[in-house]
């Protein structure tokens, strides 16, 4: 259940000048990503600005992207919430239109204890038992870490198939890998940690950089998996400045600016996020030119 491949793109959400969702550009971008190294599209996650999207906008994006990539790639719906009831309702609605999985972030702001986190994810999984669920641990944003012990317990639930581990803690990821079944999938939540996490048993990455270098990420992962570690390391080190530059300010501000530099009409970020300033744009332009991305 839930084979999502190795390169999952955390897709941005394009907006029009009036601030409404640009579904046409979303479809065009989705098709381009699938043609350039993306196995699965993660729609309405952090990079997709889910905190400032309405549930209706999210649902419409799921429909648009599903129709665009039908038969070519999988779609994971970001339906997370710090309300268990809302997360269940959104996930059930997404499941009915045929998404291939759901990404569920650790509930933010209200900081539930580990018992509450377990009950939250268990309830969502049980409400949609046929839908693969990917946990999403990003304590820097949520204020609460999903402990390895809780992940291990959750991995016993049939349709909880993996975790996007964005704590930045390699020891934590290692503990999860050590204590969970081999079929439980670990995905890097930071592009710069993809190769280190592959070395301790991760399957791939939920990537921001794959908007720009999806094929190169595929090459890096394939090289590592075939024993060509030096080749994989060379690709990682070549791309590392890009990985770092895409996070010099709050994601998705830099990646949206990078796409604009390539000519994509992705629009602004929604408030309270702000657009990239001149310094960020100049740094992006320099690293992208060095990699022949513009």
Swiss-Prot record:
Pfam families: DHDPS. Pathway: Amino-acid biosynthesis; L-lysine biosynthesis via DAP pathway; (S)-tetrahydrodipicolinate from L-aspartate: step 3/4. Gene3D superfamilies: Aldolase class I. One of its GO terms (biological process) is diaminopimelate biosynthetic process. Its main location: cytoplasm. The record marks 46, 109 as: Part of a proton relay during catalysis. Keywords: Amino-acid biosynthesis, Cytoplasm, Diaminopimelate biosynthesis, Lyase, Lysine biosynthesis, Schiff base. GO terms for cellular component: cytosol. It is an enzyme of class 4 (lyase). The active site is at residues 136, 164. The keyword Ribosomal protein does not apply. Pyruvate binds at residues 47, 206. It is found in: Cytoplasm. Catalyzes the condensation of (S)-aspartate-beta-semialdehyde [(S)-ASA] and pyruvate to 4-hydroxy-tetrahydrodipicolinate (HTPA). Belongs to the DapA family. Homotetramer; dimer of dimers. This is 4-hydroxy-tetrahydrodipicolinate synthase. The gene is dapA.
